[in-house]
Amino acid sequence: MARVFIYSPHPDDEVLSMGLAMLHYLANGSDVHLVSMSNGEAQGVANTLNGTANGNPVVCSTPADHPYIHSPAREGYTPHTAATIGDARIKEARAALGAMAMVPPVTPGVLGTVTHHVAGLPAEYGAPGSGSSTAPVTPEGIAAAKAVIKGFVDEYPNSFHYTMSQSDDHHDHAACGFALRELKDDAVNKVPWADITYKQALVNARFFVSRLYWALSQPDGQYPPDVASMPGLSWFNYYGANYDRYCDWMRNQVIDAYRAWNPAAGAYGIGYHQVPTQFTRCFPPAGSAEKIANLWHA
């Protein structure tokens, strides 16, 4: 069976930008390895769930769900730190991966498997110390991501490797894209054909474009200018006749892992608290003019 590696810069990126591709591979019997590059520690959402920052009240950022100030004492959980947010986000990713693994197989009895790896890169690894997610990616950030990816490529040479585009405006996403791009370019230009399985694994590497950058022609569509010139930019369309089934599975099963609110079980809906509009745009109700899809390039 094919072995597929998905390098997710933070927990939720695998669902928001690569989820349909993951479902396709699982439903067709592939072994899918999710590599969470970092825990996604974040003080901002910790402040939201704590209801306070520097002594000032913080109103929840998802008013459609609950337009109030959170209170750990009232709602029954220990106040959060950036570290506990990271732990909770990893749990969300594992829950989402488990829901993906339950997708009905295309061929009865031919089931894909899931494995979750946590690379443990520090928060803001793409540009350490920058203080801004959109700061330019640094050589150190690319090197950190490259070391993680190369470890899996070396261990599993006969495999497929996917991550986010180097054109993404978030430096952690871009670090993963540049890292895999450098490995791919080296494989194409430097690796001898005697190492055919290693070479083929990286030659087939692909890069997914964040939903934020799909609307290249919309007046309000901000996107890195080089996205439109990426080689091989196309919709991931291997799912064919199963498209609607995968969409329904994502909408009705998988994204609940990032929306569920159950503090007693360690579920805090962190994905939705952080980027509610991304979840809304990626997974609209059935019949919406917007489609669930993944956009990638070579």
State the predicted function of each range.
Residues A187-Q222:
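Short, flexible loop segments at boundaries between secondary-structure elements
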Residues R211-G271:
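A conserved mid-domain beta-alpha-beta active-site/ligand-binding segment of alpha/beta enzyme cores
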Residues A2-F178, E182-P192, W235-F236, A264-Q274, ...:
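Active-site beta-strand->loop->alpha-helix modules in alpha/beta enzyme cores, enriched
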